């Protein structure tokens, strides 16, 4: 099927419509830990451009006083908390609690008051208290960054939709260890689960929300 035929099929199915954004967004940075942003780790890749783009977006969000939430994958040394995922992807065993690969990439400049959620599954919702964190902070929209596009970003995008959170995914702020799955999953995310936008568009949305709320930008 050609690209034009694919476009026609998706248009006929009315996929890829835009979601209505709310007025209380948060930024969710999924698994931008050293284990995914440093190619020295078996699970990692050089995501320098994506990390730098995300840092810029985070700084805009911080200036607007938006909630910023990080997630990281980590397992106990005995790996008994890893379930079937470690059998399917044994490289994840390098991500052990207390080790450097679980640390949030320091280039993102995480602040002490910014929440870190430890997770053991693909979705940021699976087995975590993310739902209660979002409810307690009255969040109604998510701007999602992180890695990997084909794994935890996609899984979290699906759950965000199912939990009722309109979501923006800035394309410059998500990455994968290979380009083909990255592009394919961005295509699917845009078609079915969230709005894939530019980092500039995401920043403009944050600034518009801040102006309406009276926060500094």
Stretches found by the model and what they are:
Residues 1-111, 205-217:
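Active-site acidic carboxylates
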Residues 63-66, 138, 164:
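Glycine-centered short loops/turns at secondary-structure junctions
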Residues 98-146:
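Internal catalytic-core helix/loop-beta-alpha segment
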Residues 117, 194-204:
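Short acidic-hydrophobic, aromatic-tinged amphipathic segments that line or gate anion-handling sites
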Residues 143-146, 164-179:
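A short glycine-rich beta-strand->turn/loop micro-motif centered on a GG-aromatic cluster
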Residues 149-156:
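Short glycine/serine/threonine-rich phosphate/pyrophosphate-binding segments
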Residues 177-190:
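Active-site-proximal loop->helix
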